[in-house]
Design a protein with these regions (language model features):
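Short amphipathic alpha-helical segments
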Residues: 1, 51-55
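Short acidic/glycine-enriched loop/turn segments that link adjacent beta-strands
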Residues: 26-28, 49-50, 90-94
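Intrinsically disordered, low-complexity boundary segments flanking structured domains
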Residues: 27-28, 42-43, 69-75
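Short beta->alpha transition motifs characteristic of CBS
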Residues: 1-4, 43, 88-92, 97, ...
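Vicinal oxygen chelate
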Residues: 55-105
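Short, charged/polar, Gly/Pro-enriched secondary-structure boundary elements
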Residues: 37-40, 47-49, 104-105
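Core segments of cupin and vicinal oxygen chelate
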Residues: 2-39, 45
Length: 109
């Protein structure tokens, strides 16, 4: 389960713009998916938790994912959102790091 931050509607829009499908929603809860990755987004805000939460998503082609991320323009359209280009880290994995509007750090590899 992932916390949405202070604006649940904005969080849902962000993930939809990023390419996630909205599978279903109920008051205060939504399920989103992308390929084989699925998560529940909760209408909950806890800044300390959000700033210390990380999500990991495995993607088939990291470079293609980076191009899709750039093409989505979420980096320009959503305040506080930023990303680091594909980088090979000391632990031997290439990753894209994305900070979502709530401050959660996403690792795509």
């Amino acid at each position: 389960m992932l916390v949405a931050g202070p604006d649940f509607a904005l969080a849902k829009a962000f993930f939809r713009d990023l390419g996630f499908a909205l599978d279903w929603e109920a008051p205060g809860l939504a399920q989103l998916s992308l390929g084989g990755a699925t998560f529940l987004l909760q209408d909950f805000h806890n800044k300390e938790m959000q700033d210390n939460l990380m999500m990991f998503v495995s993607v088939e082609d990291l470079d293609d994912w980076w191009r899709r991320l750039q093409a989505s323009r979420v980096l320009e359209r959503y305040a506080g959102v930023h990303a680091k280009e594909p980088t090979l880290y000391a632990w031997g994995q290439r990753e894209v790091h994305l900070i979502d509007p709530a401050g959660v750090c996403w690792h795509f590899a």
